[in-house]
Amino acid sequence: MLHSLPIRRALISVSDKGGLVPFARFLADHDIEILSTGGSAKALADAGIPVTEVADFTGFPEMLDGRVKTLHPKIHGGILGIRDNPEHQRAMAAHEILPIDLVVVNLYPFEATVAKGAAFEDCVENIDIGGPALIRAAAKNHEAVTVVVDPEDYQPVMDAMTAEGGATTLELRRKLASAAFARCGAYDGAISRWFQGQVGDETPRHIVFAGRLRQTLRYGENPHQKAAFYGHGIARPGVASAEQLQGKELSYNNINDTDAAFDLVCEFAEPAVAIIKHANPCGVAQGASVVEAYKAALACDPVSAFGGIVALNRPIDRDSAVEITKIFTEVVIAPDADAEARAIFAAKKNLRLLLTGVVADTTAPGLTVRSVAGGMLVQDRDAADLLSADLKVVSKRTPTERELADMLIAFKVCKHVKSNAIVYVKDGATVGIGAGQMSRVDSARIASWKADEAAEAAGLAQSPTQGSVVASDAFFPFADGLLAAAKAGATAVIQPGGSMRDDEVIKAADEAGLAMVFTGLRHFRH
């Protein structure tokens, strides 16, 4: 086994030329012959670095508009030949194949081409063929060949060569080979997913997901669990794309909760705020301004909001920053923040401030993935957008315009509450949220109890659920959950419908004087 091998000849063919010139100059200073192609060769020559064109090295020109550059025995034989195998060495000598010890390749920007909405033909032309072949060949023969697919690895290679007298260690080569195969897998996965979308294959025989390491986390949900955060490059504004302006590194739970918060608040067209704990909303509201929305959202459950995540769908101004910093908040995420708001947050050193630049389109298609023992569940993300025209009035009484507006907000929030979910809303703000109960009637009771508790703490004469509307994420299987909401003071109900006992539930609503609408749309969240 070959451990520390000197590098004498390198092949460089890169699309991302960041850091290329300093790295190549380092190689040249170590008397390493550099072979290169096209734009890479030009960049090196322009920098005054000695370089040999691959076409001159092989004696075979680039052809087919550059589709064939490095697919040649003198290239692949030089990479794949086993250095201590006599037969390989005899064959290489017979065909005048020289060993290539370092392969530096990064691939055509296929993912970026797709992300910018390029035409089908442009996307196809950005599918790299020669690059993956070079990478896989070098990674396979990692006992003798060093492969680099990421500019971030230039420095570790230079450090190793400096320490090892122009060589790299087997340990480093294996690590780089692992990264190389991972990059090829991610690249092929991106291509296959794009093609599946182009041909409308909703349940492909094989599916590949890949991500790039964004952050090694201190631990996972709990301190005994290891964790990391990966970005997959899909252009959707949120925690993965946000700029963190201040505060400690995000934890696993911070990331999970912040994602839930921003996903929820982006549902709203009007200025809105969501406060989240353990991926469930403590309070959500829309208002004429974000500061009004924040105050209303906080009023829903100020006790649970302590140490929570605050998401806004508008830039943060001074007044909202003042209100948010009155209690301990882990993370604030918003499209932007003005200078005064940033200065106020800066005084709270532990508060993490994330800015996304824009809000997300919650109706855009996407996938959610969950692992199970021996497999994974893949589904479309819940991107359904409910409009008033979609509602079916099933009660004798028709909801008022105010009730209708609050119903749509309540059902919007319900979509983001763990099932079984019950949400009371009044005047554009949640006033009671019941989450995650095995019994729907218990969720209704808990939401009412939480509202009563908040009202008592605020010194209100009556519970804010009086005169509210109530939403359920799934149908009421019996009338008991609806009656619990009526007892809490709700005047109108929005629910999917579809129970075998819908008639019984409708009758109970009519007897209680409630207006009720069916959506025909369920929002389970587990």
From Swiss-Prot:
Q: Does this entry carry the keyword Hydrolase?
A: yes
Cite the entry's keywords alphabetically: Hydrolase, Multifunctional enzyme, Purine biosynthesis, Transferase
In the record, biological process GO terms are: 'de novo' IMP biosynthetic process
Q: List its EC numbers.
A: 2.1.2.3, 3.5.4.10
What InterPro entries does UniProt report for this protein, alphabetically?
AICAR_Tfase_dup_dom_sf, Cytidine_deaminase-like, MGS-like_dom, MGS-like_dom_sf, PurH-like
Pathway noted in the entry = Purine metabolism; IMP biosynthesis via de novo pathway; 5-formamido-1-(5-phospho-D-ribosyl)imidazole-4-carboxamide from 5-amino-1-(5-phospho-D-ribosyl)imidazole-4-carboxamide (10-formyl THF route): step 1/1; Purine metabolism; IMP biosynthesis via de novo pathway; IMP from 5-formamido-1-(5-phospho-D-ribosyl)imidazole-4-carboxamide: step 1/1
Single Gene Ontology MF annotation: phosphoribosylaminoimidazolecarboxamide formyltransferase activity
The record's annotation in NCBIfam families points to:
PRK00881.1, purH
Entry comment, domain topic? The IMP cyclohydrolase activity resides in the N-terminal region.
| The protein, known as | Bifunctional purine biosynthesis protein PurH
Q: What is the lineage of its organism?
A: Bacteria, Pseudomonadati, Pseudomonadota, Alphaproteobacteria, Rhodospirillales
